[in-house]
A protein has these predicted regions:
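Active-site machinery of serine-nucleophile hydrolases
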Residues: 86-88, 92-142
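C-terminal catalytic histidine-bearing segment of alpha/beta-hydrolase fold enzymes
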Residues: 209, 213-215, 232-285
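Short alpha-helix in the alpha/beta-hydrolase fold that links the catalytic acid
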Residues: 104, 218-235
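Gram-positive cell-envelope targeting signals
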Residues: 1-39
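Primarily recognizes the serine-hydrolase "nucleophile elbow" in alpha/beta-hydrolase
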Residues: 151, 157-201
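Short, proline-enriched alpha-helix->beta-strand connector loops that line the catalytic pocket
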Residues: 121, 200-206
Length: 285
């Protein structure tokens, strides 16, 4: 090959090698960034419901390895996209709202899940439908709370709960086991079945409300629970002013129910969902 031809061949080969190198060093195409994990439920853990009621998706099921299938209704504001932390509210119903009474029956029997929306429009509301008011349901409530705290963008300082009647029994057991999961608790027309010491240790504010002549429980168990927590706080050295910020005892007289058209003090517990002083206290914590 002549010198000139050899030179041209060398230049051509070098140019081809440079071109191949440029192609191989080009940045690979970028994959789209997946949405944050907190914006949607884990499909492997949850079967989503297909029915709705006034903004709630009904009969979702959390499949817990330890606690079995946990049925719940949930309201997630349309504005929630996982980019900012939202509050979280659990409302546990009385006997008439348990799962065997029918899907969504708790939302038809009680208004807590609806009136709560007036206090914070950036709040996810969970309305479980459990099967009893004992240890099993308490453990399922804890598992459900842990699921929402782990899979949604939740402000840990704004995690609220109420329990009405049997739901209050369940929620008091939860408070006796894992009070640190919650910011404040509203105990309505019920009795306290859980331990007291964990509540005192965690300094969880509790509001007790019941009719003075509640037909199912009477007001005595509520008074006793308040007194027990109060005594423990005194032992801890808290002042009355400090205790008053953590404990509220609100025993309603007969007129409270009669004036609002309720013939029953126990059944009239749903009135508490519409009481701005009570609900305002909960969501003001």
């Amino acid at each position: 090959m002549a010198p000139l031809e050899r030179l041209l061949a060398f230049v051509l080969a070098a140019a081809m090698q440079t071109g191949l190198g440029a192609c191989s060093s080009a940045a690979p195409p970028q994959e789209s960034t997946p949405p944050p994990a907190e914006t949607q439920p884990d499909d492997s853990l949850v079967t989503e419901g297909t029915q709705t009621d006034r903004g709630f998706v009904l009969d979702n099921v959390l499949h817990s390895e330890a606690e079995g299938d946990i049925h719940y209704n949930v309201y997630i504001p349309e504005t929630y996209d996982g980019s900012e932390p939202y509050a979280l509210y659990f409302t546990l119903p009385g006997y008439e709202g348990l799962y065997f009474q029918g899907v969504g029956e708790n939302l038809r029997q009680e208004d807590f899940g609806f009136t709560a929306q007036q206090y914070n429009d950036r709040m996810i509301i969970v309305a479980p439908q459990l099967s009893d008011w004992g240890e099993t349901s308490a453990d399922q409530t804890i598992a459900l709370a842990e699921y929402f705290l782990g899979h949604y963008n939740i402000d840990p300082d704004k995690v609220y709960a109420n329990g009405y009647s049997g739901g209050g029994e369940t929620m008091s057991l939860v408070m006796g086991k894992r009070p640190e999961l919650f910011t404040a608790y509203l105990h309505c027309s019920s009795r306290w079945d859980g331990a007291y010491e964990p509540v005192v240790k965690s300094r969880i504010p509790v509001y007790f409300v019941i009719g003075e002549s509640d037909e199912y429980y009477g007001s005595e168990p509520t008074q006793e629970a308040y007194d027990a927590l109060h005594a423990l706080y005194v032992q801890e050295g808290l002042s009355e002013e400090e205790i008053d910020r953590l404990l509220v005892l609100d025993i309603k007289d007969a007129a409270y129910f009669e004036e609002q058209g309720s013939p029953s003090q126990h059944g009239g517990g749903n009135l508490f969902a519409h009481d701005a002083q009570i609900m305002g206290w909960l969501f003001g914590q």
